Amino acid sequence: MEFNQKHLKFFFAFLSGVLAYIFFLLRYLSSPPTRLINENIVGLWLVEIFIFFLLTKNEAFKKIKTIRFNYKFLLCLLPIFLIALFLRFYNLANIPPGVHGDEGEWGLIELGVLNGKYREFFSLAQKGIYFDFSILSFATQAIFLKLFGVNILGVRASSAFAGTLSLIPFYFLAKEWLSKRGALLATLCLAVSHWTIAYSRLGISNIWTVFWELWSFLFIFKGLKENSRPYFSLAGVFMGLGLYFHHTFKVIPIILIIFFISLLAKEGKQFFKIILPLTCFLLMVLIIFLPQLIYYWQTPGSFSARIDEVSVLNRVEEYQSKYQTNSVSKILMTQFLKTVGVFFRGKDIGFFFYGYQGPLIDIVSLVLALIGLLIIFVRLMENKSSFLLIWLLSVIIFGGALTIDAPSSQRLIGLAPALFLMSGLGMEKILSFLKTEKLKNFLLLITMISIFLINYQVYFKQYIHSDAGWAQKEPATAIAEYLLSLGESYKVYMLREENPILYFHHGTIRFLAPKIQGVDVSENTRNYILAKDTHKNLVYILPPNSKFLSLLHQVYPLGQEHHFTNPYNGKAWFVGYEIRQDNYNIEN
């Protein structure tokens, strides 16, 4: 083979990439886990990723130039995109009305990134089972905190952004598999789904799973269609980055492994035609995620800590008692059926985040998805059909049946695009029975309007005016707002002895009222009250009907008592008992 200029460029690009990556790894490995890894290391990591991608640059640009756009359908897509933007950003600071504790913790970690507290970008925010996500993911989301301000809007904006932009890869993926009308219907379903809206308006990272998986799947199927290294390389980039974000993304490699094994079994020797592009994909995933893998290797157990915590297999005795059976297979089948049932009858146990108790999918989208599922079984030998079925079953099993507290909508969110692709497939089949274009367009329009109205009603009319969400059940947001109204001159005593839900160091309170000083009182509450702190204005936060309220009246007779009720159900929430410092002398 003649060694021409093209090969020479490839050789130097490859050599540069290898040398850059070796240099990066040497720098990274020379720093012990306890040492801060500064921005120079991250910059070097980004540079070498770019150099590796240059290997397929020319071919990638050629691919982009060949893309043909149907402007008529892009104009139809624009209103859907604008609707999605509105549904995710409208009054984002106040809807949902309560600030979830995890949103508060997310905001505090993002603020820590901005303030330089967290600089080990390839380590975890917190060791253990809570917030054990890569600092790199928090750093990405912290950009929005910088842009929108250190407030709940800044925390939630990253999710709204990811949820909205997910429509772009989804539409082009749908176009690969469906007709133009089917793709539009599927895109609208994803855009207006109350389920995806809910997680696009929460300041946590679950919705980023949808964002990264859709870009990964889009370029994998573009790569399969054209046997293209650039597309597979791009898929590897998005796949590697996705692994830095939420735990729910960890099911994506499982989906792809099962799919490629099925592809090998189905195509035999023909499969080996994609070995080189597939190698590019795996190489890019490894290049991008290797720094985090090294961290996991240096800190054994950190990779699977959360998985071990939520695995139902680690709580077999508990679930044997719960389901009244000694059979593990019956437990898993019950879990599986409950997870499937959340799309039909609701009962989301994951009320800690969303908590809407109706079906996660509106009735119109659900009926269309069931039609689509039947079509998938008929066309199971097609790649897109087998992939959708693997996607569907993998998330239901690994995000539902095998986890505690199933079904939990936050763990199933990565399944939403698959379900709506099935809806588009069902719509496509129904439209095929109509003869005229006018009838097809009319039915499509009526269906899309119906789906929009149902989902809008569920989220913006029913859900946010109920106590279905955990942040709308717990009083942390109301407590934080109450303390802010009192000001920094007050010291807070949070009496936890009778109600462990009330605690001062709750993420919501610390994020919304960071300058307020306070302590949690979990025991010897009577002694704390009798000690008569006279250094500042005081406020005691205690549960309604607390036995200590009468004692406060005895010790501080001039104190003011304020009762707070949950505005969504009218139930008593908490009591604030205020004592001003200038009343101490009068009392004494």
Residues covered by each model-derived region:
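Membrane-interface transmembrane helices that cradle and orient dolichyl/undecaprenyl
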Residues: 26-27, 51-56, 214-234, 242
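Hydrophobic/aromatic-rich transmembrane helices and adjacent perimembrane loops
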Residues: 199-200, 206-209, 251, 363-368, ...
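Catalytic lumenal/periplasmic loop and adjoining terminal transmembrane helix
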Residues: 26-33, 248-249, 429, 433, ...
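Transmembrane-helix motifs of polytopic, lipid-linked glycan transferases
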Residues: 157-180, 215, 219, 368-375, ...
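Transmembrane-helix signature of polytopic, membrane-embedded enzymes
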Residues: 170-192, 382-390, 441-445
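Transmembrane-lumen/periplasm boundary regions of multi-pass, lipid-linked membrane glycan transferases
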Residues: 95, 105-120, 125-127, 133, ...
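Multi-pass, polyprenyl lipid-linked donor-dependent membrane glycosyltransferases
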Residues: 157-165, 184-215, 229, 245, ...
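Membrane-embedded, hydrophobic transmembrane alpha-helices
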Residues: 1-79, 234, 255, 259-262, ...
